[in-house]
């Protein structure tokens, strides 16, 4: 642990605090995710299960669009994960109104997201918590999927998963209806929400409760029929909704060409069994048509420091940082 010199506080989540540090041996800049102690019931062998899951998964994965786990160390019931340091994330890029996002930029972000996701799904892993601030970008503009705390291997058949995954705005309708068995479709729906957010520069379906989330989905995309989604009525928390016609996608995404609209439509299919997969998405016309994706080194970089942007939109963050720094003294 002493080989790392702390440089900066980067953020705090429900389960962890993240610091920027320098590896004294290699001079490499890294990010250290310090996992908070779980409650007694959670502390398994002294280590929080979420961390164990993340370590096991990440050690097995190697792909340019997936965050690299460099090291893991711990003592007693405390564990730290050492990752590649990433300059920023997609949420920061989307929120920075001084940046222009061109169709080529958006295509590059989608391409890298789907390549990372295809690799995960080919290894029988669902991410289950995709959102813009889990898509990290390094200084070369390479996007990497991160925060595998909720990731789960879906190879075991009939595994009853929990449906309380994925930040609500990115949550697929089957999860909102309480599905305990689900597959790659939950990640693909989240990708659709992220793509929409890249195009609109604001969250696409920002619901403030599960019911409100479903209402927003159906008002925007139309209420699905039994034909469109045969298993819908048998889901544990299914409730009937008013029949909304939905808004045509070309009226929502006015700048999008037909190839892009086709991809969006595939990502937002209600039936998870027919929803487009990552491999299928990568083979769509959208990715073979011009314009091509922007090379990483030419992608926009945030104009003001990441921390300032986040604190601006979330004053509690500044307070948390000051508190964490005080505790570190």
From Swiss-Prot:
GO cellular-component term (any): transcription factor TFIIH core complex
Superkingdom of the source species: Eukaryota
Molecular function terms, GO-annotated: ATP binding; ATP-dependent activity, acting on DNA; cyclin-dependent protein serine/threonine kinase activity; kinase activity; protein kinase activity; protein serine kinase activity; protein-containing complex binding; RNA polymerase II CTD heptapeptide repeat kinase activity
Catalytic activity annotation: L-seryl-[protein] + ATP = O-phospho-L-seryl-[protein] + ADP + H(+); L-threonyl-[protein] + ATP = O-phospho-L-threonyl-[protein] + ADP + H(+); [DNA-directed RNA polymerase] + ATP = phospho-[DNA-directed RNA polymerase] + ADP + H(+)
Subcellular location(s) per record: Nucleus; Cytoplasm; Cytoplasm, Perinuclear region
Active site (UniProt): 129
Activity control: Phosphorylation at Thr-162 is required for enzymatic activity. The association of p53/TP53 to the CAK complex in response to DNA damage reduces kinase activity toward CDK2 and RNA polymerase II repetitive C-terminal domain (CTD), thus stopping cell cycle progression.
Membrane as UniProt keyword: no
Modification(s) after translation: Phosphorylation of Ser-156 during mitosis inactivates the enzyme. Phosphorylation of Thr-162 is required for activity. Phosphorylated at Ser-156 and Thr-162 by CDK2.
Residue ranges, annotated region (Disordered): 309-329
Domain Protein kinase: 4-287
Binding site for ATP: 10-18, 33
Enzyme Commission designation: 2.7.11.22, 2.7.11.23
Residues that bear Phosphoserine: 156, 313
Modified residues (Phosphothreonine): 162
Keywords: ATP-binding, Cell cycle, Cell division, Cytoplasm, DNA damage, DNA repair, Kinase, Meiosis, Nucleotide-binding, Nucleus, Phosphoprotein, Serine/threonine-protein kinase, Transcription, Transcription regulation, Transferase
InterPro entries named in the record: CDK, CDK7, Kinase-like_dom_sf, Prot_kinase_dom, Protein_kinase_ATP_BS, Ser/Thr_kinase_AS
UniProt GO BP: cell division; DNA repair; meiotic cell cycle; positive regulation of meiotic cell cycle process involved in oocyte maturation; positive regulation of transcription by RNA polymerase II; protein stabilization; regulation of cell cycle; regulation of G1/S transition of mitotic cell cycle
Quaternary structure note: Associates primarily with cyclin-H (CCNH) and MAT1 to form the CAK complex. CAK can further associate with the core-TFIIH to form the TFIIH basal transcription factor; this complex is sensitive to UV light. The CAK complex binds to p53/TP53 in response to DNA damage. Interacts with CDK2, SF1/NR5A1, PUF60 and PRKCI. Interacts with HINT1.
Annotated family: Belongs to the protein kinase superfamily. CMGC Ser/Thr protein kinase family. CDC2/CDKX subfamily.
Task performed by this protein: Serine/threonine kinase involved in cell cycle control and in RNA polymerase II-mediated RNA transcription. Cyclin-dependent kinases (CDKs) are activated by the binding to a cyclin and mediate the progression through the cell cycle. Each different complex controls a specific transition between 2 subsequent phases in the cell cycle. Required for both activation and complex formation of CDK1/cyclin-B during G2-M transition, and for activation of CDK2/cyclins during G1-S transition (but not complex formation). CDK7 is the catalytic subunit of the CDK-activating kinase (CAK) complex.
Name of the protein in question: Cyclin-dependent kinase 7
Species per Swiss-Prot/TrEMBL record: Rattus norvegicus
Lineage of the species this protein comes from: Eukaryota, Metazoa, Chordata, Craniata, Vertebrata
């Amino acid at each position: 642990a002493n080989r790392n010199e702390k440089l900066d506080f980067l953020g705090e989540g429900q389960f962890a605090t993240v610091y920027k540090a320098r590896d004294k041996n290699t001079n490499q800049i890294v990010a250290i995710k310090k996992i908070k102690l779980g409650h007694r019931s959670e502390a398994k062998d002294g280590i929080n299960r979420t961390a164990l899951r993340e370590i096991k998964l990440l050690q097995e994965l190697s792909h340019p669009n997936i965050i690299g786990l460099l090291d893991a160390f711990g003592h007693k019931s405390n564990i730290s994960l050492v990752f590649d340091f990433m300059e920023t994330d997609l949420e920061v890029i989307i929120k920075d109104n001084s940046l222009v996002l061109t169709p080529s930029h958006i295509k590059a972000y989608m391409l890298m997201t789907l390549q990372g996701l295809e690799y995960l799904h080919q290894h029988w892993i669902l991410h289950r918590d995709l959102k813009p601030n889990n898509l990290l970008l390094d200084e070369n503009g390479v996007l990497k999927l991160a925060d595998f705390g909720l990731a789960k291997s879906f190879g075991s058949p009939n595994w009853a998963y929990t449906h309380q995954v994925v930040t609500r705005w990115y949550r697929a309708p089957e999860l909102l209806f309480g599905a305990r068995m689900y597959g790659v479709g939950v990640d693909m729906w989240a990708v659709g929400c992220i793509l929409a957010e890249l195009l609109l520069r604001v969250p696409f379906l920002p619901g403030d409760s599960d019911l409100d989330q479903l209402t927003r989905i159906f008002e925007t995309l139309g209420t699905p029929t039994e034909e469109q989604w045969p298993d819908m009525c048998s889901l544990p928390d299914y409730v009937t909704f008013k029949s909304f016609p939905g808004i045509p996608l070309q009226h929502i995404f006015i700048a999008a060409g037909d190839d892009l609209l086709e991809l969006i439509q595939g990502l937002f299919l209600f039936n998870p069994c027919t929803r487009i997969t990552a491999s299928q998405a990568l083979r769509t016309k959208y990715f073979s048509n011009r314009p091509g994706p922007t090379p990483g080194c030419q992608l926009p970089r945030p104009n003001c420091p990441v921390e300032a942007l986040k604190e601006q939109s979330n004053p509690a963050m500044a307070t948390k940082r000051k508190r964490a720094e005080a505790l570190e003294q």
